[in-house]
């Protein structure tokens, strides 16, 4: 029987527990273990490591527990400082060390606000109301996650314009082992930020290598969207938002899958890379012996070397890029224009379709293939 995965609690729940611990400290009551009700009604019990009085208020430290979710903040300390204010109505949120600040429009929070999402804010408001018996208690809540300054480099925050650290997140307060759907949804705000910045043509790349290559072609960082393996999902989200067009820029291994109609490109979902290359190369005149060599290749780069030795690489790559466009636009039922640029790991352009060239001319990109 499969073992049930353990749930944990979010950084937002850690902060809310810290606020409640601060109130209990002020009241002279035990604060070492905090009971909370998550926004979805789930009861939470969160241990508190320390509570101290500082010049800025009462500071509580809670160590994040992520359960069986592969979360980068597992084990980090979340410090929440509570300062009650008679001169204010409601709660003012502040970003402490390692918590980011919103610097670009398009997010759910205004520019200049600490990146403390609405779920944690609401959970903290409920805690303050519970502990004071009032909805309008004046308070200043500062959340610091010192490890967040470095951890943010491993997130999409720099792309989203969240500077200075990570975000305090959590929809309900409960951290359940991340589903694929949750990961996909975490990618979508990139599109909103790019659209808010005025980018009408977006550039989809699977990861950091694609991003580096895109920048080398003169493509604006604001237009670059990391999609991971979820090309189809992200195309749909872009089309829903009225995006004028998308350029798909990626390595041969990704683009040949899209040319075959595969829009979730993880190798456990589907892997017809060599078969697709072999089919298009054969259609362009590759010999039967070389087709077998393509099918026996270890990688798409090895397969392309076989095709190149026959003098067909340029033609085959151009056909594949064109086929990516056709497949993607068909996938979207013609709701958005799509172009394709295929590159190798060295960043050399192997294939470009006509729509990609049109995008490049309009946007000033350098596509030299």
Regions found by a protein language model. Give the residues of each.
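Bulky hydrophobic/aromatic packing residues
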Residues: 155, 183, 187-192, 356-357, ...
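Surface-exposed flexible segments
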Residues: 79, 217-220, 353-359
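Generic N-terminal targeting/processing segments that precede catalytic cores or assembly contacts
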Residues: 1-154, 158-160
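Short, amphipathic C-terminal "tail helix"
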Residues: 337-369
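A structural signal for small-residue-enriched, beta-sheet-centric alpha/beta enzyme cores
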Residues: 6-9, 160-166, 171-350
